[in-house]
Amino acid sequence: MANSTSSSGARSRATQQIDISAIREFGEVLLTSPARLCFIVEERYENDVMPGAVVDVLSSCGHHVDVLRPSGTVADLWELLPTDVARYDAFVLKTVSSGPGLSLLEAAAAAGVTTINDHRAIRLARDKAVAAVRARAAGIPFPKTWFASKSTLLDQIPPARYPLVVKPNDGSAMRDVYRVDSPGELAQLDIDESGSLLAQPYMPNPGYDVKLYNPGDEVFAIVKRSPLHPGADVVEEQIPVTPELRSLARAVGRVFGLDIYGIDVVETADGWVVLDVNDFPSFGMVPHAAYRLARTVLRVIRRQAAARADARAAAPTVYRSTRTPVVEAKA
């Protein structure tokens, strides 16, 4: 697409050092026939490890990868349209909620190109109000949630429901998340009023959440300090994944239709509760995360290509007559 940058182009982010042992471990999928990919990277993530590390791994394995930066690119949408030879096998997106990247991803999907994650799954996860209802309707343990178009409406929540956690409906990376202990405290908060808000009952915790990361077909559990307890003495580390946590993470993936995702969970007296669902998180502390993600990207491309081939094979054959129709002369 116009002004996209090849993976071999200069980047201000440090290039991922390729781990030969990891290439051997994941090479069965990574070292396949070359794929053509376009990563859409929002400005906030241009200098982050992810998704640049995935780009580096794919490029080192012989795949062609372009990086499209919406913050500085005029995208020619007509280049997305089908031709005899598709320009890309897939578009991959790491986006912010209010960024332009998702519109470009949806445009690619409208042209029939594979998107990772599926553009509909990203929409579900990005709108936190929709995500809460989707999860609850599917039986995923999720806190009761209130939606308000502005903060002054939150005073309609009964005082008995406090303390609350208040956060933006389109938030990400746990930014602008507040614990509110009383209606009076709510009135004193300097809340960004540019978008809608969610409120949920505060779930007591020991100062940390557990992030469950799914880079493909595996689940990793990482202890992370809670944004509601910034001063807590927490050792951030990988912990064993119990059958309950693995089942919960995979259930979320199925319900939302995500291939690459993470969820924030907290343990309560009634069991684990999901606090948030994120498409393409940072995958911090996941071993060989970039290689696992690269493998998943290529597997999704294969899966979608096979599904399209099966659909074509199952489609009824339309036979057209080659005979010249006979036109009767009018009397």
Segments (PLM) and residue ranges:
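Conserved N-proximal alpha/beta basic substrate-recognition cap immediately N-terminal to
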Residues: 42-144
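Extreme N-terminal starter segment of soluble prokaryotic enzymes
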Residues: 33-38
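Rossmann-like NAD(P)H-binding beta-loop-alpha module
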Residues: 143-162
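Phosphate-binding site of ATP-dependent enzymes
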Residues: 175-256
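A long amphipathic alpha-helix within ATP-dependent nucleotide-binding catalytic cores
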Residues: 229-274, 278, 286, 292-322, ...
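Short N-terminal or domain-adjacent regulatory/targeting segments
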Residues: 2-5, 9-31
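Protein kinase-like catalytic core scaffold
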Residues: 164, 198, 220-221, 261, ...
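A short beta-strand motif that forms the metal-chelation/ATP-contact edge
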Residues: 90, 212-214, 221, 271-285
